[in-house]
Amino acid sequence: MALVKVGSHPSHGGQVVFNATASFTLDPSDSGKVFILKDAAITVTLPTLSTSLAGFQVKLISGDDSEHIIAGGASKIYGQIGDQNGGDFERIAAASGYTLGTGEIGDWFELISDGTNWYISGLTDNGA
């Protein structure tokens, strides 16, 4: 199984944690969930933007050192990714996706949509 729920108690804010061990596509019911990406390079495909998606929020955490990919942003991903090792931020503007070039356990990304765009923030140890 590619998505396995971890535990039975939702975290603060009603979030539920899942281990993701294969690539998958998010859908509107995944809003508020946390996904731990592990055991392989995982591609997470974003849902199609629409006004009904306004308020969608998801957190992706690297559970290994793979090169995970966020896809399907239709040139509508904006935000910043902090690079702890490099001491700077990578600006993301009108991107369709993002690839974690040198993954580390604990790297994380949060994506929020207003229905028109995706807004990404995150922190990596080694940058993109």
Regions found by a protein language model. Name each.
Residues 1-88, 114-128:
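Exposed extracellular interaction/assembly regions and N-terminal maturation sites
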Residues 90-99:
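A conserved acidic, glycine/proline-rich C-terminal tail/linker
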Residues 101-103:
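Short proline/glycine- and polar residue-rich coil/turn motifs
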Residues 105-113:
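Extracellular disulfide-bonded cysteine-rich modules/repeats
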